[in-house]
A protein has these predicted regions:
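RNase H-like, metal-dependent nuclease domains and their acidic two-metal-ion catalytic environment used
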Residues: 1-35, 42, 46, 50, ...
């Protein structure tokens, strides 16, 4: 993947096999297995909220995404996706886009990000590639 610097994946339930496979393929410095918990929501949701408020996080204008974000509830002082699922025309949703955004922010915080870099070509005397 171009510019891939890291990923956080939900390691609960069905996602555990995918998270484990990603960690094996990309290594622990680029793939993080996350057990979503109240503590994780407490650490990550403020990043999500501030990203939306200061407009550094841009969300697509989509009914499913809007529904996911509207489903957030504050439970014991922590914003989180409620346990019950909602339905849309394609089937069940469970705050998928909220969790995806939060996982992206988790990966950026925990794994860092790749700094953009540039390179300078080196001229090789005597090498003529004009015929290629």
């Amino acid at each position: 993947l171009p510019r891939f610097s890291g990923v956080s994946l939900d390691a609960r339930g069905n996602g555990s096999a995918l998270a484990e496979a990603a960690r094996q393929q990309y290594g622990p410095e680029r793939a993080r297995e996350v057990m979503i918990s109240e503590a994780w929501y407490r650490e990550t949701m403020p990043l999500l909220k501030s990203g939306i408020e200061d407009k550094t996080l841009v969300l697509p204008r989509d009914a499913g995404v809007l529904s996911d974000f509207r489903s957030l509830r504050v439970v014991r002082g922590v914003a989180r996706v409620p346990e019950q699922r909602t339905r849309d025309r394609t089937g069940g949703r469970h705050g998928d886009s909220v969790v995806a955004c939060a996982m992206m922010l988790d990966a950026r915080r925990e794994l860092g990000s790749v700094e953009p870099w540039e390179y300078v070509g080196v001229r090789m005397p005597g090498l003529d590639l004009s015929g290629w």
